[in-house]
From Swiss-Prot:
This enzyme is involved in nucleotide metabolism: it produces dUMP, the immediate precursor of thymidine nucleotides and it decreases the intracellular concentration of dUTP so that uracil cannot be incorporated into DNA. InterPro entries: dUTPase (IPR008181), dUTPase-like (IPR029054), dUTPase-like_sf (IPR036157), dUTPase_trimeric (IPR033704). It comes from Burkholderia vietnamiensis (strain G4 / LMG 22486) (Burkholderia cepacia (strain R1808)). GO terms for biological process: dUMP biosynthetic process; dUTP catabolic process. Keywords: Hydrolase, Magnesium, Metal-binding, Nucleotide metabolism. NCBIfam families: dut, PRK00601.1. The gene is dut. This is Deoxyuridine 5'-triphosphate nucleotidohydrolase. CDD domains: trimeric_dUTPase.
Length: 148
């Protein structure tokens, strides 16, 4: 799949989104910063990537997801948990960065911060009904299928 990428900050030419391995599902996104940013515990900040994408095809969307190592080791996750990039969005990719950890965290310029995953999208149409055909599960939720 070819994807239109617009470089909004010339410094990002050296830090384009890339797959870390041949089996990677996510492209690494980097922090487009002029200087280090310190996030105190509980603090959230919006970090620019210096890049914009245009998927164009409504059959696709992009998800911005946290990097597992940053979340597990440092408590750095996304403030909005998942960023959804619609196919018609053309603005800069921004990363809502939240320090849910107990220690301050310093984010350095061009550090890998999040990952971008391209996913297929199905736009559903609703069929209004009065009742559903009975399923085995029915209305059971939140633990209704058991713990183990």
């Amino acid at each position: 799949m070819k994807l239109d990428l617009k470089i909004l900050d010339a410094r990002m030419r050296d830090y384009l989104p890339a797959y870390a391995t041949t089996g990677s599902a996510g492209l690494d996104l980097r922090a487009c910063l002029d200087a280090p940013v310190t996030l105190q515990p509980g603090e959230t900040t919006l970090v620019p990537t210096g890049l914009a994408i245009h998927l164009a095809d409504p059959g696709y969307a992009a998800l911005i997801l946290p990097r597992s190592g940053l979340g597990h080791k440092h408590g750095i996750v996304l403030g909005n948990l998942v960023g959804l990039i619609d196919s018609d969005y053309q603005g800069q990719l921004m990363v809502s960065t939240w320090n849910r950890g107990q220690s301050e965290f310093v984010l350095n310029p061009f550090e890998r911060l999040a990952q971008l995953v391209i996913v297929p999208v199905v736009q559903a149409q609703f069929n209004i009904v009065d009742d559903f055909a009975q399923s085995e599960r029915g209305e059971g939720g939140f633990g209704s299928t058991g713990r183990h």
